[in-house]
Design a protein with these regions (language model features):
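Short, low-complexity disordered leader/linker segments with a strong preference
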Residues: 1-38, 59, 407-418
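Short, solvent-exposed loop/beta-turn-alpha elements that line the ligand-binding surface or hinge
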Residues: 110-124, 165, 188, 208-227, ...
């Protein structure tokens, strides 16, 4: 899913305090007793699929009832932080990469190492994303990669050949210039200030890094990372993308949906909305991202985790394991909302929208790079936005903005280690 930028959390201290101040509210019910589990999720679009999965689980486990609690993503982690600090978080809930280490490091998640989960059933990048200090805390639910969505009608009108899987950065940049027609309000691409969909991908394609493998230092000031950032600022300066101010007024996502953007770097999750839109339903298609110095795309995905203070740990663990089963994955895939993480179940998702080449998102798995995270990802996510905004609005050079970001990010990472 698209990971919206959020302000730096103050959750660390609250979660640390709650880790020692609270304990499980009660012991797990006996094997013969009836229990109700609370299941926290944030996407209403996926609720129908989750209800089907819950129904299948309850049929197999008549003594367990699962109550799905949907909280909008904008409020989800704020409410979860409060609930976890007070010992009342859902028994099982969705977790994403940027927040995972914060909760795992503060003892809020239950180890699933003994839940009978075969981690070879999922992409290794997703398994490792939800592992902390060698312990598995999350069961991979789904994953997403980023592809090049494009408007076939705009390409045809401009006489430009459609993108292929062999496109390079140069091919993409040349097409963006030819497709831009400001007299019609059409731009080649929207260079949004988004890491997951845009600049993380080009940083990795240029051979750069966002954060070091040990999570202790920023990679933004390397020549390769700067090249990956300039990929986007150059498109803005040349006029092949709207300005940052224009994109703040009208998001490129909306421009693409309305036929005013020829190309859009977007996720596998966008298929649902594009298929429901009158314009993109028939005019859009997708292929793999263009190749830079090398191929790369960001991979991210959600996991189901168990609250360490659940009153029903055995039942919660059992439900989490079921959520990671092939049966649950098949249900998710059939709805077409997300790519299920369980290996071998993805083709049903591909077939859900035959008008699009969704296989492209799976073809990228061999070179996918995990979404960059640390113990307090949100702290330096905020620094990315504040510093790179100056480069995106062209008021500051990319090397200068990257240098300032590196200094501030290194300080934030050093604070994590204290």
């Amino acid at each position: 899913m698209r990971l919206k930028r959020i302000a730096a959390l103050t959750a660390s201290l609250a979660l640390v305090a709650s880790a020692t101040a609270c304990s499980s509210s009660s012991s797990s019910a006996s094997s013969g007793g009836k229990v109700t589990l609370n299941y926290g999720i944030w996407d209403q679009t996926q609720e129908p699929a989750m209800k089907q999965i819950v129904a299948a689980f309850e049929k197999q486990n008549p003594n367990i009832t699962v109550d799905i609690q949907v909280t909008p993503y904008t409020d989800y982690f704020t409410k979860l932080q409060t609930a976890a600090s007070g010992g009342s978080a859902p028994d099982v809930f969705w977790m994403n990469g940027p927040n995972f280490q914060l909760y795992a490091s503060n003892g809020q998640l239950m180890s699933l190492s003994n839940a009978g989960i075969d981690t070879s059933d999922y992409p290794s990048s997703m398994v490792n994303l939800y592992k902390y200090n060698g312990t598995q805390y999350g069961v991979p639910k789904d994953f997403d990669t980023v592809g090049l969505w494009y408007n076939k009608a705009i390409f045809k009108a401009a006489g430009v050949a459609l993108p292929t899987a062999n496109w390079t950065w140069a091919d993409f940049q040349a097409a963006a210039a030819k497709l831009t027609d400001k007299s019609k309000g059409i731009y080649g691409v929207g260079a949004t200030l988004e890491g997951q969909e845009n600049y993380y991908n080009t940083i990795f394609q240029a051979g750069g890094t966002v954060i070091s493998a040990d999570g202790k230092s920023s990679g933004y000031d390397s020549a390769a990372s700067i090249s990956g950032l300039e990929f986007w600022t150059n498109l803005i300066s040349k006029g092949d993308s709207p300005t940052l101010a224009q994109m703040n007024d009208t998001a490129p996502y909306d421009m693409f949906m309305s036929g005013k953007l020829a190309m859009f770097w977007g996720g596998s999750w966008d298929a649902v909305a594009f298929a429901a839109n009158a314009n993109t339903k028939t005019n859009a298609d997708v292929t793999v991202l263009p190749e830079g110095v090398k191929r790369a795309t960001v991979i991210h995905g959600l996991a189901n985790v168990v609250y360490a203070k659940s009153a029903h740990p055995d039942q919660a663990e059992k439900f989490a394991a079921f959520l990671g089963s092939k049966q649950a994955a098949d249900i998710e895939a059939s709805t077409g909302t997300v790519i299920p993480a369980y290996n071998g179940t993805q083709q049903a998702w591909v077939k859900a929208y035959p008008q699009y080449d969704l296989q492209s998102f799976l073809d990228e798995l061999s070179y996918a790079v995990p979404y960059p995270i640390s113990k307090d990802t949100a702290a330096w996510n905020a620094l990315e936005t504040s510093n790179l905004t100056k480069a995106w609005d062209l008021s500051e050079s990319v090397p200068t903005a990257a240098s300032q970001l590196t200094t501030q990010m290194n300080a934030a990472l050093a604070k994590e280690a204290q």
